[in-house]
Amino acid sequence: MKQIRRWQRILILALLSISVFAPLIFVSNRLKSITPVGRREFIEELSKIRFTTNDLRLSAIEHEDGEGLKGPRLILFKDGEFNSSAESDGGNTYKNREEQVIVSQKMTVSSDEKGQILPTVNQLANKTDFKPPLSKGEKNTRVQPDRATDVKTKEIRDKIIQAKAYLNFAPPGSNSQVVKELRGRLKELERSVGDATKDKDLSKGALRRVKPMENVLYKASRVFNNCPAIATKLRAMNYNTEEQVQAQKNQAAYLMQLAARTTPKGLHCLSMRLTSEYFSLDPEKRQMPNQQNYFDANFNHYVVFSDNVLASSVVVNSTISSSKEPERIVFHVVTDSLNYPAISMWFLLNIQSKATIQILNIDDMDVLPRDYDQLLMKQNSNDPRFISTLNHARFYLPDIFPGLNKMVLLDHDVVVQRDLSRLWSIDMKGKVVGAVETCLEGESSFRSMSTFINFSDTWVAGKFSPRACTWAFGMNLIDLEEWRIRKLTSTYIKYFNLGTKRPLWKAGSLPIGWLTFYRQTLALDKRWHVMGLGRESGVKAVDIEQAAVIHYDGVMKPWLDIGKENYKRYWNIHVPYHHTYLQQCNLQA
């Protein structure tokens, strides 16, 4: 009996020893396997538990005061809530912790509810796409996007403005200690900041000089404390600054317009070389081929009015290269006597083997009035583009091409990207002009009648509506036969003469075109003609790629230095920069 009791005591002591030393052994092994990052997380978890005991105790008291105990909230997750492939490792670790807490909460529910909980836990495990564990030494933090900010830069520039303002408050010739220190700190800070626009561009020296500047500004605020005088001075400074900004804007706009009106040196050089080459040819060699197709109505006829060699070349080349049947194309290039030799020589040197090209001199035709140039000068515009004969000669198309019934009118600042032959199959429904409308508010191409036309005039207000839908030149399908029936050229001449006597519309061919073809236009799908590449319009790249014709309307033409670089590439691919004349005139992409 004593032997049995002794063995019982030994067994009990052994079990007690195991219960004491076993946890120590397991915990020590666990701590050895924890990485430095894991130890830091373990300590952070302990600190969170230590500081949240009071909250837990208060929460327990609140539950006791309630009507009854509530079970744990069962959180259901959807497939869309777990997208580990698009998140960082740190984000997945954070989500894994939440899932462990949720599972542990569910395991504490009574056994009666286990049948409902276990399928939910299994569903959670099946739907979750877990990432592999973090490697040793890898940071367990969320990846922050690297965004360049300018908060500190703006703060520093604000302090520079404050310092300049305080210096303006100082009496003339003042040489006090505060003024000296303010000038010194201002020079140092301006030199350190330089032209930085983002915080990443700031040097360490600039950041170190912020605190001394703040101290000097505080001293200056104690010295210059006459608030009414300071307010008056600040208002004067604000007014002067606004005047300077407005003057700079006006100057920039003027220079932009001046650049748009000026012929680049390279283009002038090219025209001179081509003109010289043209007059060195024998008269019989100046003739273009396939002249029998000029007035054949079975062909697809295009017309462009231009005084620019490269611009007209791009329009012709892009149209032919985009066509499925280039042999059916007849292209009429209408220019003036000054540019006729250069443009003729260019197309003689670069003859299109399939299409037919005709070069016309508007000055050799008898379709325009003799005093047309003087009438155009009465439009009170200094911009030669608006008072150009070529710009208004489009209203005489039925007289220029008496043997044709339908044609497509293209401006010389467009690029054709799609086959345009389908335009000839469009039913015009008795209309004269097919065009893309520009009357949808909110779009970059939006234009209103009231912006360009003077509806305060009684004659205009009684005949036209300011809410009528506008449309654009640039790519237009013209029914010349219907034009002749409605005698719209006579209508244009009538309106033009009225406009020379009193201001009825802004200079240019677009406003008078709206009036001449009022209610005579057919709306085309906007993908036929996308505008805005020659100005700040924000046209979408998708719209450009899908467009049949893209239009560089505005002053930022692709052949000018002020053209938008991201849009020039559509134009440059149709310019033969390898040509000898272009290289000699230093014309480059």
From Swiss-Prot:
The chain crosses the membrane at residues 7-27. Residues 1-6 are cytoplasmic. It is found in: Golgi apparatus membrane. It is a single-pass type II membrane protein. Glycans are attached at N83, N126, N317, N454. GO terms for cellular component: Golgi membrane. Residues 127-151 are annotated as: Disordered. Expressed in roots, inflorescences, siliques, leaves and stems. Pfam families: Glyco_transf_8. Disruption phenotype: Reduced galacturonic acid content in cell wall. Residues 136-151 have a biased composition (Basic and acidic residues). One of its GO terms (molecular function) is polygalacturonate 4-alpha-galacturonosyltransferase activity. Belongs to the glycosyltransferase 8 family. Probably involved in pectin biosynthesis in cell walls. This is Probable galacturonosyltransferase 6. It comes from Arabidopsis thaliana.
